[in-house]
From Swiss-Prot:
Species per Swiss-Prot/TrEMBL record: Methanocaldococcus jannaschii (strain ATCC 43067 / DSM 2661 / JAL-1 / JCM 10045 / NBRC 100440)
Disulfide bond annotation, renumbered to this chain: none
Protein's recorded name: Uncharacterized protein MJ0687
The organism's taxonomic lineage, starting at the top: Archaea, Methanobacteriati, Methanobacteriota, Methanomada group, Methanococci
Length: 335
C-alpha cells in the first residue's frame, strides 16, 4: 500500500469543501452561501475516486467515504480502513493485518469543522472564477466553474458544484482529479461505521496520542521538549497547533506541527526521536543560519523547504514562500 498517496487522499477528501457559484456573485457572497450550506449539512456518504498523474505515472484510488459532523469520518477500500469516532483514530492495513491507533484530544473540531466561509473567501480572492454553465454529474445538477490563479495563470482548476448543497462533486486540477459518486447528504450513518474492532490476529504496530489546539501553550503540555515558536511568520497567523506522541517497536517519538495562514501557506514540523538529522558538510543546498546552525534548503518548485536541527529538535519548515522568508522564519526560532 502506498502510504504517501493514502495520506494525500485523506487530506484531499477532508479538506476539499470549497467552491462557488454563479457568475454574478462576489467572493463575500459565495463564501457566505457556502458557509450556510456547510453548517446545514450534518453528514455525507459517497464513493470517492482519486486519480493522480505524477511524472507520467497514473494511480487511481477508490474509497467508500462517510463523514459526520463535527469529527467522525470513515474511509475504506480493499487495502485500508481508516476510522475516527471523534476520540480515537485507527488506520488498519488489511493485507498485512496491522493497525495503528491514535487517541485524540483537544479542539478536534478545528481539524474537521473549520470556518469554511473564511477559507472559501480567501481561496476565491486568489483565483479568477469563471462560470461555465450547468451540467449533470452522477445524476445531480451542477454548476461548472473554472478557477485560474491570479498569480500563476497556468494553475487552473475546474469544479462541478452540486446546485442543492453547494459542495464540489468533481474537481479537476493539474495532476489530480477527485470525484464524489453516489453522494448522499444528511443521511443517518450508523455509529458502528466509525468504530474499529481489531480482527483476530491483528497486530498493533504503533499507538499514541494527538492533541490539537489554536493555542501553542496547550499542546506544549503534551510534549517533553520545548516547542520552538517562530518570532517571525511572514505576516501569517497561527491556525492550528498539533502534537502527537507515538510508540512504535518500543521506540517513542514526539512531533509538533504548527500551521500558519488561512490556506496553510506555512507549516513547521518539529520532532524529537532517537535519529539525528544528518546535514552534509558541503553542497549547493547547505546554508548557515544564526549562531552557526547548519541547514538544508530546497527552493525548486512551488513549495520551498528548509531543514535543520537545534537543541536536539529536528525542524522542517515548508511553504509557498520565498526562500529568504523561510530563512528569516528559521532564524527567528534560534536563540
Amino acid at each position: 500500500m502506498n502510504y504517501k498517496y493514502l495520506i494525500l487522499s485523506l487530506f484531499l477528501i477532508v479538506g476539499v469543501f470549497f467552491a462557488g457559484c454563479t457568475q454574478q456573485m462576489n467572493a463575500d457572497e459565495i463564501a457566505k452561501k457556502m458557509q450556510e450550506k456547510y453548517e446545514a449539512m450534518k453528514s455525507m456518504e459517497a464513493d470517492v475516486l482519486i486519480t493522480t498523474n505524477i511524472m507520467g505515472q497514473t494511480e487511481t484510488m477508490q474509497y467508500k467515504y462517510a463523514f459526520e459532523k463535527p469529527n467522525k469520518f470513515y474511509m475504506e477500500n480493499d487495502d485500508v480502513l481508516i476510522v475516527c469516532d471523534g476520540k480515537t483514530y485507527y488506520m488498519y492495513d488489511k493485507k498485512k493485518n496491522q493497525y495503528t491507533k491514535m487517541e485524540i484530544k483537544g479542539e478536534l473540531n478545528n481539524m474537521f469543522n473549520p470556518d469554511y466561509g473564511k477559507f472559501i473567501k480567501s481561496m476565491l480572492e486568489k483565483f479568477n472564477v469563471s462560470y461555465l454553465g450547468e451540467k449533470t454529474y452522477d445524476g445531480r445538477k451542477c454548476y461548472v466553474l473554472e478557477l485560474i490563479s491570479k498569480e500563476n495563470p497556468e494553475e487552473k482548476m475546474k469544479m462541478y458544484v452540486d446546485e442543492e448543497y453547494w459542495q464540489p462533486l468533481k474537481i479537476e486540477m493539474d495532476g489530480v482529479t477527485i470525484e464524489y459518486k453516489n453522494v448522499k447528504f444528511n443521511v443517518d450513518v450508523p455509529d458502528d461505521r466509525f468504530k474499529f474492532v481489531p480482527p483476530e490476529g491483528a497486530k498493533l504496530m504503533s499507538s499514541g496520542a494527538m492533541t490539537t489546539s489554536k493555542n501553542i501553550d496547550e499542546v506544549q503540555k503534551d510534549v517533553s521538549f520545548k516547542i520552538l515558536v517562530p518570532k517571525y511568520t511572514a505576516g501569517l497567523e497561527l491556525q492550528n497547533a498539533m502534537a502527537t506522541k507515538q510508540n512504535a517497536n518500543n521506540e517513542e517519538s514526539e512531533t509538533v506541527i504548527l500551521t500558519y495562514g488561512e490556506n496553510g501557506e506555512l507549516a513547521i514540523i518539529e520532532s524529537k526521536d532517537n535519529k539525528p538529522l544528518t546535514i552534509p558538510e558541503n553542497g549547493s543546498n547547505l546554508i548557515t543560519l544564526k549562531n552557526g546552525v547548519k541547514a538544508l534548503i530546497s527552493d525548486s518548485g512551488d513549495v520551498k523547504m528548509l531543514m535543520f536541527e537545534y537543541n536536539g529538535i529536528k525542524v522542517i519548515i515548508a511553504g509557498k514562500l520565498d526562500k529568504n522568508e523561510l530563512i528569516k522564519i528559521a532564524n527567528s526560532m534560534i536563540e
